[in-house]
Curated annotation (Swiss-Prot):
Annotated source species: Gibberella zeae (strain ATCC MYA-4620 / CBS 123657 / FGSC 9075 / NRRL 31084 / PH-1)
Gene name tied to this protein: MIR1
Region feature Disordered, mapped onto this chain: 1-69
Induction: Not expressed during infection.
Lineage: Eukaryota, Fungi, Dikarya, Ascomycota, Pezizomycotina
Protein name, entry field: MFS siderochrome iron transporter 1
GO cellular component: plasma membrane
Length: 609
């Protein structure tokens, strides 16, 4: 069956699992202490959380998929009940390879984007791109979750990989900043959705107890790409002298992994249909009926209100410094007002008017899910307030080459690749995860504050790497445990939706962080540059700010280069100070988490990790 046929059938399926305010029949009453959730009732009815969200009961090792779940969940359960160890190993290897490509993609992006924007004299607008792409990506996670649950994991994954490939091709052939920004939206939505779908697959193919190790496994390729990716990206800048081939290479390689992964899922699903493990359930709504159903089910109006409102509201904070009259410019004021009103109307639409709300109410009422989402939001904002210009800072201020700057900025990938296995193993042994935040949060905030001290021009790079290592320790724990906390609080049928809610929070955080970073940059770097440049170079301030190539053209220790470095330091200190202030919110969110014992819970069926 083709993917297109599958999608058409998915549009015709009846969605029998809309969120209800009451518990499902299989959900049992539980009690919790402030720190540990305990279960009551027989062993086969143990649940994870109280309130509106409950996971599957412990004894769900039956040889048939659950009946009270959506079609995509039923199909993935049928796959895990049907496949053998070879198929499971093939899936895990393909996921690992996909994350290897993702690591190269991330390294390429960090190193190449400063040169991409500089080609069009738009280095100062570097944060504009992620504001738009992150906001639109955040708006697409919830519909993506519904696609995975209604159409199926394989179809949703293939659709997103298609968007990612298209975006990469458009980035490679773009000839101006506007085209590159549009390509970045396709790429970001597709890549983010693809990685999200793989995250859901990793949850489908692993027990909750081993999920930390599963996520650590998928992150391990980053230890390779932290060095190889940065070196390869530098080669495109220095040797090939064409950044477009960096994105083009990823576009060529990506289908070589995504198509086999899609086929592994489809082949095993076909076996499940043949064996009678699962049967096809369809309802004929007709073409226009299916279109109308999809329009409402995927909340298309909500997507555009949320994504568009967020973009229009956040962009002025980045553009005001370039506007003719600054903050008093008419279109800057209009964008802020229109964006804010659009976000208000989005709330009104979702609460009173939307046929199927964008976010599920049951998740918004569970304190553990809310806490994990707020931790993710806080982490992304605090991290991206300073990180977008970090690679440029390392080259211009610390005098590193593109490859070496990529190595330093990839410290997170190396540290997390090792640390995640350790944390995942400890969680597997203890069954609890909340304790990891008690050392991760102080380390992260301390390192972020310490980084402020090492932002002076020509500072010893070893101190910066030391701070990066500590920041990476905290960040790696956040990324792993946030996902685990959300997944431990829901049943298998809600895994995709719960992860999507977490990803929405992260996407919004990235967009807000980019807006703060851009606002600080445009309102501090350029004024300081004009103030500090030698008289003979003041007329070139705009050209210098717009291109990293122009910045690097001035010799080290020359008056102009020192002025540029001091301006970078001035802006970076304020970016980091904002990050530290925002990170202090962790102390509010962490106590809200429930300390669920994942050793006693089981969500999946069949042969899993």
């Amino acid at each position: 069956m083709s993917a297109l046929t599958k999608i058409r059938e998915g549009l015709a399926r009846e969605d029998n699992t809309h969120v209800a305010g009451t518990l499902a029949p299989h959900e049992k009453e539980i009690h919790e202490t402030p720190e540990v959730v305990s279960e009551v009732g027989p062993d086969h009815d143990k649940e994870a959380t109280a309130g509106a969200i409950n996971p599957d009961d412990k004894g769900n090792d039956s040889d048939v998929p659950s009946e009270d779940v959506q079609n995509g969940v039923k199909e993935i359960q049928a796959i895990t009940l049907t496949w053998g160890k070879g198929s499971l190993a093939a899936l895990l290897c393909l996921i690992w390879t996909l994350f290897l490509i993702s690591g190269f993609r991330g390294s390429f992006y960090l190193v190449l984007v400063p040169y991409v924007t500089s080609e069009w004299s738009a280095h100062s607008l570097m944060t504009t791109i992620p504001i738009v792409s992150d906001a639109m990506t955040a708006a697409c996670y919830i519909p993506m979750a519904k696609a995975l649950d209604v159409w199926g994991r394989a179809e949703g994954f293939l659709l997103m990989s298609g968007f990612a490939t298209l975006g990469l091709i458009l980035m490679a052939v773009s000839q101006n900043l506007a085209t590159f920004c549009a390509a970045q939206v396709f790429y970001s939505v597709g890549w983010g959705g693809m990685i999200y779908a793989v995250g859901v697959l990793a949850a489908d193919a692993s027990n909750l107890r081993n999920r930390g190790l599963a996520f650590a496994f998928t992150s391990s390729p980053y230890m390779i790409t932290a060095f190889a990716g940065s070196k390869a990206a530098a080669a495109f800048v220095i040797d090939v002298k064409n950044w477009r081939w960096g994105f083009g290479w990823i576009a060529l390689v990506l289908p070589c992994v995504t198509i086999p992964l899609f086929l592994v899922l489809k082949v095993n699903l076909r076996k499940a249909f043949k064996n009678g493990t699962v049967t096809k359930t369809t309802r004929n709504r007709g073409f226009f009926g299916s279109i109308w159903w999809a329009f409402n089910e995927f909340d298309v109006i909500g997507i555009f209100l949320f994504g568009g409102g967020l973009v229009v509201f956040l962009l002025p904070f980045n553009l005001a410094g370039h506007a003719p009259n600054g903050w008093s410019t008419g279109y800057i004021i209009a964008m802020i007002i229109v964006g804010f009103c659009t976000l208000i109307f989005f709330g009104v639409w979702e609460y009173w008017l939307a046929p199927v709300p964008f976010l599920q109410g049951r998740f918004l009422l569970d304190r553990s899910v809310v806490a994990a989402c707020m931790i993710d939001l806080t982490y992304q904002v605090s991290y991206y307030t300073w990180n977008y210009f970090f690679t440029s800072f390392l080259q211009v201020v610390v005098n590193l080459g593109p490859a070496e700057a990529g190595y330093v900025n990839s410290t997170f990938q190396v540290v997390s690749g090792v640390l995640l296995f350790i944390v995942g193993f400890l969680i597997r042994k203890t069954g609890f995860y909340k304790w990891t935040f008690y050392f991760a949060v102080p380390i992260y905030i301390f390192a972020l504050g310490l980084m402020i001290h090492f932002r002076a021009p020509n500072q010893y790079v070893g101190y910066i790497i030391m701070c990066e290592i500590f920041i990476s320790i905290g960040g790696a724990v956040f990324i792993l445990v946030m996902q685990l906390a959300v997944l431990a609080a829901v049943a298998h049928q809600y895994v995709a939706a719960a992860l999507a809610t977490l990803y929405v929070a992260g996407g919004v955080g990235g967009a807000v962080g980019g807006a703060i970073s851009g606002a600080i940059w445009t309102n501090s770097f350029i004024p300081q540059l004009i103030k500090r440049l030698p008289e003979s170079e003041v007329a070139n301030a705009t050209l210098i700010a717009g291109s990293i190539v122009n910045q690097l053209a001035y010799p080290v220790d020359s008056p102009a280069r020192l002025a540029i470095q001091e301006s970078y330091g001035f802006a970076q200190i304020r970016m980091l100070a904002a990050g530290v202030g925002i990170a202090s919110l962790f102390f509010i969110w962490v106590p809200m988490l429930r300390n669920i014992d994942v050793k006693k819970l089981k969500q999946t069926k069949g042969l899993v990790l």
